[in-house]
Structure formats: C-alpha cells, structure tokens
Amino acid sequence: MERKYSHIIVIGVDGAGSWFKDADTPNFDRIFKNGAVTYNALSSKPTISAECWGSMLIGVGPEVHKLTNRRVSTLPYPLWSKHPSVFRRIRRAYPKAELGSYCDWNPITKGIVERLMGVSHATARDKELTPLICDYIRQKKPDFLFVHFDSTDGAGHKNGYGTKEHISAIGEVDTLIGYVHSAAQEAGILEDTLFMVIADHGGTNPGNGKGGSHGGWTDEEKYVTFAAVGKGVSSKGIGEMNIRDLAAIILYGMGIEAPSFDEKGWTSQIPKGLFTEYDGVYRDISHLTGAAERISREHHKSELL
C-alpha cells in the first residue's frame, strides 16, 4: 500500500464538540478553507475523554479497549494488547519513523500510547506546550505527531459547554493551532502533510452557574468537529463519520493496511468523501452499544511530567 503523506499532524481539542462553527477561528477557517470539514462526526459512548481518545488512537470502541480516565491515569497501555495504538502500528511499519505525542492531558501519552515505542513526548498546559510542539516540528519533522489541547474542556466544565466562555476558549486554541500549522510550514513539510483537527466530545450547559458535564448522548455531547487538509483531501464534503475513524485515516495516510472490519474489534473506517482517490464501503455501526454510560463533571486532573 502506497504511503500518501510523509507527515501527519493531528491536533485534538478536548471538549470542543461542534462549537468550532460558532467560535472566532480565523486560523481554522484559513487552514481548512480548501479542506474537508464536518461538525457532525459522532463521538464514542460514553462521551468521556479516555473512551474517546482511546477509540481514535486504537480504532476500536470503548467496549473493546475498556479504557477509562482512571485507568489511563494509573496504568500503561499494554504492549501485548491485540488492539495496538496507531503509534505501535506505525512503529512496526516504519522502525525509524519520528513519532511524537505532545499532550496537555498526560494520561493519553502514559495510558493510551504504548511505552518503549520511542515516542517523543512532552506535557504542559496548552499555551506552554505549544512552543515545545513548534520547536519539535521544526527540529524533528515528525512522521506522525499527536497533539492534545485541554483548556477548552476546562472552560466547559467551569462555565458550561457552548457558553461564551467556552466558545472563547476555542478561539484561544485556534491561535495555537495557527502556530502549529505555521511551524510545519517553516519546517518545509507542509506540502506533504496531512493536517487534522478533531474534538473528542462536547458537553452540557445546565444554565445554573455550576458548569457543564459530559458522558451522555445528547446532540451537544455526541457531535464533534473534524477537519482535514492535504493533497488528495476532498473539499466536497464528508459523509457519515465516527471519531474512531481517525485511526483508519492515519493508517491510510501512512500507507499501512488496516485490520479487517470486525464488530468485536477494529471498527475504524475511512469516511466517504474524505479522500478524492478513496471510495470504499462505509459500514453502519450505530447499533454498537459502547461502554457503560457514566457522567464526567470535573475537569481532568493530570500531573505535569
């Protein structure tokens, strides 16, 4: 299978839901003007960070990977799992690839990305993390880089999701997205990069001043933003999409054959209309139940290492 891109950069924006469409995001709008954008990508059940980021980076549902916020905060993801992350799959295909995981919420790197994979990593709050990300891109020109920004989820928990404070936080992260995109341009890799932004979940706004939560399956919680730009990305519109499809998209871009579709395992697919040269089957997975529902009412607690 032919490798489509020399570089793939994914920026995850925690708790942003579909509200990119409502925020002041000049960088997002500029970057993805000729790319593919949807505000209706479907999250994973329950709409909680570990379940969602796990699905995106592993390509299976929460009922299969069984990750929770507590688990990823305390246990490393096993090297022997029969459901490896995209980092492990890329490392197997390209032993010398430069891989990076730069996350505000450090349990993603500690509990979803396998150890001993030679993955460059750093953690800090969004604004402090961004210069580290940009330096890494300029110096190392990574084959695959995953970035996680978390301030948006914090704003949702504190003020309610979809409030002016939450939407303002998305606008602030838009500035950081612009810096990361500019770093790829300065590194001379942008023309051969698949550049993506994705949210994991949205959240609720009870309107009582006590802040929002997520974990349920309301429209405000389950529909999220996804955007992609790069050579071969269509601008005509994306069909049905689940956030777990990110894993299949990454493997396709890297030229790595994805596992066969299996409702008890790999359920990540490439959405119709995303790539001009891809026209595969997209299966309905709406009947898959996900993991047991629970509600997250507090912002992440993550040590900075």
What are these regions (language model features)?
Residues M1-L305:
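Feature captures the catalytic ectodomains and active-site-proximal regions of enzymes
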